[in-house]
Amino acid sequence: MSPLPLVESDDNAIPLTLITDVKLDDWRNAQADAVKAWLSATGFSGKAGEICLMPRDDGTVASVMVGLGDGEDKWAAGRLARSLPEGTYRLDQIVGVQDKDKNQTATWVALAWCLGAYRFDRYKTEPSSLAAVLVWPDEVDRGYVEGAAEAAILTRDLINTPAEDMGPDALAAAAEALATEHGAVVKLTIGDDLLSENYPAIHAVGRAADVAPRLIDMVWGEADAPKVTLVGKGVCFDSGGLDIKPSSGMRWMKKDMGGAAHVLG
């Protein structure tokens, strides 16, 4: 898994101002004439995901304005990691969001930055570099950001892996690795054992494959705790029987195990 695009600190980090569209005029009117003129010239309106680079006199980036729209779009910062010039950035101001909600907004910015930076680079000789990184905002719930980002990245990696490298055995191995990391227990029911355990449908779908079908059963948590069961479809490549699907229907069948990937994530 690639490292998250979040760093501890950088004295030279470029400040980010996040602002809602309804507060933009008030904020702009309080700025210097040069700032007002630049915002007017670029047409920055504060809509969700909009970016405006604020220049220094020497042409380098002094700061960045980021639109939040009405403030309800959790993913407004999702394109920053891939749209901003190379460098380190820090969250400086959140304008137009109530104080009680600013910590939540900062948390969503950090998570959106992580998800926006994602690239599937398993088959690249040189993994994608992180051009724009964010200093951890003080207000964020780090545990939530790291957990949610790593979960989403795992899910994406499993789905993006082509079927030749993501068969039933590979998906089961991913589940076992996750179980080892988090203290869960995995039970695999493989091949003809599916019939004796009363899973005939799973057996029927995968019995002709070179790699035997299997049921992955992962259990985590205290035995006496309330039970929540998540079920995800894990067909690693659905050919529609004996390859009866047209090419347009076959193209994306590597993601037919996306339900299982989401459960693991």
Q: Residue spans of the language-model regions?
A:
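Alpha-helical metal-binding/catalytic segments enriched in His/Glu/Asp
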Residues: 175, 227-228, 243-265
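N-terminal hydrophobic/helix-forming segments and targeting peptides
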Residues: 1-235
